[in-house]
Amino acid sequence: MTGVISSSSIGEKINEWYMYIRRFSIPDAEYLRREIKQELDQMEEDQDLHLYYSLMEFRHNLMLEYLEPLEKMRIEEQPRLSDLLLEIDKKQARLTGLLEYYFNFFRGMYELDQREYLSAIKFFKKAESKLIFVKDRIEKAEFFFKMSESYYYMKQTYFSMDYARQAYEIYKEHEAYNIRLLQCHSLFATNFLDLKQYEDAISHFQKAYSMAEAEKQPQLMGRTLYNIGLCKNSQSQYEDAIPYFKRAIAVFEESNILPSLPQAYFLITQIHYKLGKIDKAHEYHSKGMAYSQKAGDVIYLSEFEFLKSLYLSGPDEEAIQGFFDFLESKMLYADLEDFAIDVAKYYHERKNFQKASAYFLKVEQVRQLIQGGVSLYEIEV
């Protein structure tokens, strides 16, 4: 007869499992996940331990989705994130202390992946109120890193840089966290890009790419190539940007990294429209739309429709306004600023200064929203 396994021994294994998740060590994390799952049925009754397991399984899947699509990896019996989230939500009322921290932190990570940035900040702020229960310095670095990502997407540059610095200082003290270190370099770079400090941005992107290449991580290699292209694009160096986007697309397609393809195809499409290379733009536009539909990416589908409204429909101002309303409803103010600039420049280049002026005014209004954005994140916890 098989003996009962103590919950403390399984708890130690879950801690070890989480260590491998944070290191992005998929084989070790998968091995422990399967082992722990088998042992749970033989474990003494402990509801908190079952909750801890559910939270860690959710975090495990977030790691897998970040690095490689589950469909490509063909990992057996891997539950969907949405199903895991539903299961954990049902048990939320029982969460206290460290488990409550994990729930809010992991849920914030999920919302961040869904590009629901304000919702992500809300959960991260709740997690921050429970950070007192976290004794592990690497876990604190994880929290700082995700806060930095969130503030970057909301264009709160100095908040993002400060959290990235705190995370980097911890990660560099520990071995086996090279992936997070290279991601910190990417965060520094993207924030420098927003500050228009292009040389600093390129330096950090190149460092990140070298590290991603050494780690043999195609997702991170592709993203870094994309970001270097983005840096060139931001300086209106369109011809220089194109090769980087092509290389990023090649990496994503070769490795079947579907979620990253709409973004890469969008910018290479937009560049070709700006350069007046309409036939090539159509080709990229078609592929980008197809990948967006396949990925179920509603935001990029709407962005490809925006390109059609601006460059192929006259422009269609009603459709453009509808797109702007959509971005505003999602609080995607940084994206709204960029697209309003594109429309303003479109009209300015065609010497329609009245309409250009109206859209430049829109840009200023959006910048006011971004600059005043800190108050949006003062969320009661």
From Swiss-Prot:
It comes from Bacillus subtilis (strain 168). One of its GO terms (cellular component) is cytoplasm. This is Regulatory protein RapF. Keywords: Competence, Cytoplasm, Manganese, Metal-binding, Repeat, TPR repeat. RapF and PhrF pair of proteins acts synergistically with RapC and CSF in the overall regulation of the ComA transcription factor. Contains a small N-terminal 3-helix bundle domain and a large C-terminal TPR domain, connected by a linker region. The 3-helix bundle domain and the linker region form the ComA binding surface. A RapF surface mimics DNA to block ComA binding to its target promoters. Interacts with PhrF via the TPR domain. Mn(2+) binds at residues 40, 43, 45. Induction: Part of the rapF-phrF operon, which is controlled by ComA. Disruption phenotype: Deletion of the gene has no detectable effect on expression of the srfA operon. It comes from the Bacteria. Changing residue 28 to A: Loss of ComA binding activity. It is found in: Cytoplasm.
